[in-house]
Amino acid sequence: MRLNPIKIKIYNEDEFVKKAVYFSELFEEAALYFSNKKKDTSLPKFYKDYDFIFAFNSTKSIKASEDSLTKLNKFISKYSFWKFGFFSYNLKNEVQNISSKKQNTFNIPNMFFFVPEFIIYKKNSQVYFDSENSSIDSHYILKEINSIKLKKPKKFNLNFRCTQKKPNYLKKIKQIQEYIKRGEVYELNYCMEFKTTQQICAEDFFLSTNKKCMAPFSCFFKFENLKILSFSPERFLKKINDKLISQPIKGTIKKSNNFYQNLKLVNALEKSEKDISENVMITDLVRNDLSITAKRNTVKVEELCKVFS
């Protein structure tokens, strides 16, 4: 194992990160994370560490749908190198006295993590290469990535359809209204699945969408035969020593190509009662969830209803 990561040079970062996405096709497991905003000042600097992290190939992995967190803790304790992975929606059934009957279409486990063969990441304007295996040649890996020929960007016209039929949707809305009348909830998010059967290149689609979204928490994740594409504006959790940070977001508005029009839109969003209500709701929800395991009086809301763009 290397004592320290190796500093490497990348001469065209935009091209390199695109090629890295296509390079992931060679491996069954890979995780590529993008911060996207190189000069972003909207997030506190303390909360942003990396511009990108690319992890390739699995040397060890773990997946579980029972006792997942205990198994993960043992896995983390056993291996000292980086770990990458995900928790799926149904993990909630293990930690809360609740359950759902949603169909697990892709047979995704409650938890999956892997130790990569090597990683490439950018931090504080410097790019690094790291691996547990000192025989892995960083120059060879970089040469392989740089040798990839970039494809001409494709235009996508995907037709998504909701998997829920209209009568069932209206029935669910009436149930929600009854919950609100009875005081069981005062506000909630009702999520539905949309799908398409069109064949696409996931790597092409990720790069095309990522260029448009430029979300600060974007990810391209490969797991067995599954590819997960995520473009999120919010952070679920970040751990710094004994401090946990969550940055949920609610309330959105369209963006304009005109700077002055954008200022008006920001002002409208800041004054929107609906969006303020949603933002306060999700902040209160996260605060309550963190309070379950946090030391008393340590959960603090550092910022509320600030607009990020």
Residue ranges and their predicted role:
Residues M1-S309:
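Extended alpha-helical targeting/anchoring segments
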